[in-house]
Amino acid sequence: MSEHKTTEMLQEEAAKIWAGLEGKTLTNKDRFGIPQQEMPSQEPEVRAHNMSEVALGYTETQARVEAERCIQCPTAPCKKGCPVGVPIPEFIKHIQAGDFKGAIDTITTTNLLPAICGRVCPQEKQCQSHCTIGKMLKSPEKAVAIGRLERYVADWERANDKITVPTPKPDTGKKVAVIGSGPAGLTVAADIRREGHSVTVFEAFQKTGGVMVYEIGRAHV
């Protein structure tokens, strides 16, 4: 079993890599050589005594380094693997430029639940399975960590009070009922509201959230 690395250790490693990348015009060969950034997590001795989320999320430096691994493929095969069509190269390009607000705004054009999808989507079977970097390294687990980057900018938006609510189209006067307040139900409700319709969400249980509340568990989200 490999030694657990603290957030501080991973940040130090990322800072050394970033020092060699900052201000440099990178070739694809340079990008292939950047190691995937490991996700910081609670130390085993600590997480054994709590039910908090194990994964802690990238630091800003880690996110910048990881984003630089993306070679901005013209055909964007990663996007083809995303069920909701997130503009993946575009949001990663914003991260490369240090524009985290631009990154999250790009994601939310098609996905209003990036903090959830960044945590629980099976990226290794979807977007990352199509990533050119992953194919070059013969493993989707070594692809550009798209989900971790999505999570980073979603968490950054919340932590920095930068959340913006999409402006709906003019009211149509139509009313729509959505049954269930899980991720799917909330996504449908949000998309319908964006089109100008009035939406009421019905939930049978005491709390909203569906599988996020009743099945997945706090250790993962």
Descriptions of predicted regions:
Residues 126, 187, 210:
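Conserved SAM/SAH-binding loop-helix junction
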Residues 219-221:
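Conserved small/polar residues in nucleotide/adenosyl-binding loops
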Residues 112, 182-184, 207:
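Residue-level detector of alpha-helix initiation sites
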Residues 91, 183, 210-211, 216:
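Gly/Ser/Thr-rich helix-start
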Residues 150, 190-191, 211-214:
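Short acidic, glycine/serine/threonine-rich loops at helix termini
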Residues 174-201:
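N-terminal Rossmann-like FAD-binding beta1-loop-alpha1 element of flavoenzymes
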Residues 197-213:
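Glycine-rich FAD pyrophosphate-binding loop
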Residues 2-175, 205:
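Ferredoxin-type iron-sulfur electron-transfer modules and their immediate structural context
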